[in-house]
Amino acid sequence: MTMRSVYYTGAGETLVTWQIDVDGAALAQRSAVTLPAPAMYGWPDNAREHFYMVCSDGGPYPENKHHYATAWKLAANGDLAPHGEPLTLPARPIHASLDRAGKHLLIAYNMPSMFTVHRIEGDGRIGGQVEQTASEFGLYGHQILATPNDNGVLFVCRGTDAGRTRPEDPGSLHTFAYDDGRLTHRRTIALGDNGLGFGARHLDFHPSGRFITLCVERQSRLMVFGLSQDGDLTPEPLHDVGTLSRPSNGRQAAGFIRMHPSGRFVYLSNRSFGWLDDGQRVADDSESDLVAFALDPETGAPSLLQHVDPGLFHIRNAGIDPSGRLLVCTSIEPARMPDGSIKPAMLAALRIGDDGRLTPANNYPVDVGRRQIFWSGMVDLR
């Protein structure tokens, strides 16, 4: 087996490394480590010598108590070993990434919505925090990424749906100038009614550096924005399409977004939430699938290729191997199907054709108990 990538799954405090056989579209568990709190998001350094994971013991609201950023030594085979003591964070981290130089760890938080920036020491450990003057934090931060030229940062804020006793919180997309760990606010993009009806979740960069693709979670949309060389975005999307194939009566939300290495295709998930019955997730007729789009190389315009059901419920995360031939995705937790059967939490491996279409290959049930596979991701070992 030739290994160029590994896939990580974080179920609670357990972070599992999976070997990948791209030719066979197969995965096998290799090793596992224990985190100080449940996995939230992970990111490797450029040299693939270190790996960073942010962790928290609770959900989206601030009653949880333990939040950390952790550094790990990353072996050539993908195994992880602790590297320094966990850094205590002020709130629940929801996303983390390194800047393009690998000198700073950028961390997004949802409640309160904010970000912090931390230096990376020469030995790969997490260092001190970089003080910021920026205060444009939006509502319900969800992702923070440095732009390809490392001169900008994009901060995605999802907002929240209205509840029984609270109104909707608006979503927004914030652009910042970036210089050696310091952010200066440039622009707030709040589509709809000042961000109402704009539940942005995650973005990914086109390899040309001219576009971003944005998953708008709460409205199940794919948007494409222009990206300038200085890291700013067009104030309006260049393109905007829906991700669902049919209407449903249940709660829907788009999930992950992943750009194909070639830039010719982009993939998203449509998530079904169902409802809770005595703590058990129960599926309904909502759409739970993957959707593939082709992207015009000149304009970035998306055109639908296919919807495919990988046999998973509530598909939260995915990764694509660097050859562009395999997509791996994960469901978040078990669910009871309408026929009474239990569909376990699972990993699914799908082949990617030259035309960008997905073909399901292998599924791997995982016993997570009452935990969730909140984060999973592909790491190219280079």
Regions found by a protein language model. Give the residues of each.
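Short loop/turn segments immediately following beta-strands, especially the blade-tip
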Residues: 18-25, 71-79, 117-126, 175-183, ...
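Short, solvent-exposed loop/turn segments at conserved positions within beta-propeller repeat blades
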Residues: 9-13, 60-67, 108-113, 162-171, ...
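A short beta-strand motif characteristic of beta-propeller blades
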Residues: 28-34, 81-87, 128-134, 184-193, ...
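Beta-rich, blade/repeat-based domains predominating
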Residues: 36-47, 89-100, 135-151, 193-211, ...
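Asp-box/WD-like beta-propeller blade repeats and closely related beta-sheet repeat scaffolds
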Residues: 80-148
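Blade-level signature of beta-propeller repeat domains, shared across WD40, Kelch, NHL, RCC1
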Residues: 333, 339-355, 359-382
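Loop/turn-rich, solvent-exposed surfaces of beta-rich toroidal or solenoidal domains
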Residues: 254-299, 303-343
